[in-house]
From Swiss-Prot:
GO BP term, pick one: very-low-density lipoprotein particle clearance
Region (8 X 22 AA approximate tandem repeats): 92-267
Family per similarity comment: Belongs to the apolipoprotein A1/A4/E family.
Cellular localization per UniProt: Secreted; Secreted, Extracellular space; Secreted, Extracellular space, Extracellular matrix; Extracellular vesicle
Assembly and interaction partners: Homotetramer. May interact with ABCA1; functionally associated with ABCA1 in the biogenesis of HDLs. May interact with APP/A4 amyloid-beta peptide; the interaction is extremely stable in vitro but its physiological significance is unclear. May interact with MAPT. May interact with MAP2. In the cerebrospinal fluid, interacts with secreted SORL1. Interacts with PMEL; this allows the loading of PMEL luminal fragment on ILVs to induce fibril nucleation.
Annotated positions binding heparin: L174, R175, K176, R177, G241, Q242, Q243, L244, R245, G246, R247, L248
UniProt-recorded name of the protein: Apolipoprotein E
Organism expressing this protein natively: Zalophus californianus
Length: 329
């Protein structure tokens, strides 16, 4: 009976070593995973200067900052990832980002009075769709983290190299989607800015079209009065004409000043949004790089479990294994 138990233990050890040995080529398989990452880094490199400006951009930056904070965990990373705290915090930050985006969009809509109602409705619909896509991508990030938490719990004590490679690939795809939708949202906001500028220019043009005929009529009447009236009357008409011209010039100057101010504000908003897009790409790149450090404690724990298993088998059989186990990294 003892001989049968010994044979069974030896067979079990042989099967474990057979399962562990194929893990070494997995490290070579991970090398192709680095190529998409390098390509993605080249894609986002030109926009690495994103700076938060608007409230919704600051809220989105806080969403990525929290993910970066989670990545910096070392000894307690397993406990933090396996808890619900990360998912709850990401949900709160995501809702805050969506709230700020709605508030910023409402603020822009107040400035779209001169824009045609049909154009305004179309642009608002497109912006709402872009906002929904960004929200969906952020929810995918949260869902993927929850799914990964469950997979890690199910694979404790087993090799997680394949899980790490698959999770890294998913996060790269999610990052590309979030950055792409952020760009799309910027484009929609740019259309809003163009609408504000167009409305301001149309208002100035309307003022000119309405006042110019009045000015021409005043000049015509002034010429008739000069021909028929006496000198004092001509002086009074001249004074009135000069006063009218002064007022018209003042109105035109104010309109031009307002148009210049609106253009400056729109350029400032565009610059801030471009800076925010660059910052999101830089933060996403850092998040991808730091995710790889999450699995080191799991690998060390599996190595310790393997050593304990070998010691138990050696104690049961009374002999040491002829071939040492292959460590996974």
């Amino acid at each position: 009976m003892k001989v049968l138990w010994a044979a069974l233990v030896v067979a079990l050890l042989a099967g474990c070593w057979a399962d562990v040995e194929p893990e070494s080529p997995l490290e070579e398989n991970l090398e192709p995973e680095l190529e998409p990452k390098r390509e993605l880094e080249q894609e986002v490199e030109p926009e690495a200067g994103w700076q938060a400006g608007q409230p919704w951009e600051l809220a989105l930056a806080r969403f990525w900052d929290y993910l970066r904070w989670v990545q910096t965990l070392s000894d307690q990373v397993q406990e933090e990832v396996l808890s619900n705290q990360v998912t709850q915090e990401l949900t709160t930050l995501m809702e805050e980002t969506m709230k700020e985006i709605k508030a910023y969009r409402a603020e822009l809509e107040e400035q779209l009075g001169p824009m045609a109602s049909e154009t305004q409705a179309r642009v608002a619909k497109e912006l709402q769709a872009a906002q929904a896509r960004l929200r969906s991508d952020m929810e995918d990030v949260r869902t993927r983290l929850s799914q990964y938490r469950g997979e890690v719990q199910a694979m404790l004590g087993q090799s997680t190299e394949e899980l790490r490679a698959r999770f890294a690939s998913h996060m790269r795809k999610l990052r590309k989607r979030v950055l792409r939708d952020a760009e799309d949202l910027q484009k929609r906001l740019a259309v809003y800015r163009a609408g504000v500028r167009e409305g301001a220019e149309r208002s100035v043009s309307t003022i000119r079209e309405r006042l110019w005929p009045l000015l021409e009529q005043a000049r015509t009447r002034h010429a008739k009065v000069d021909a028929l009236a006496t000198q004092p009357l001509r002086e009074r008409v001249n004074a009135l004409g000069q006063q009218l011209r002064g007022r018209l010039e003042e109105v035109g100057s104010r309109a031009r000043s307002h148009l210049d101010e609106v253009r400056e504000q729109m350029e400032e908003v565009q610059a801030k949004m471009e800076e925010q897009a660059n910052q999101m790409r830089q933060q996403a790149e850092a998040f991808q790089a730091r995710l790889k450090g999450w699995f080191e404690p799991l690998v060390e724990d599996m190595q310790r479990q393997w050593a304990v298993l070998v010691e138990k088998v050696q104690a049961a059989v009374g002999t040491s294994p002829t071939t040492p186990p292959v460590e996974t990294k």
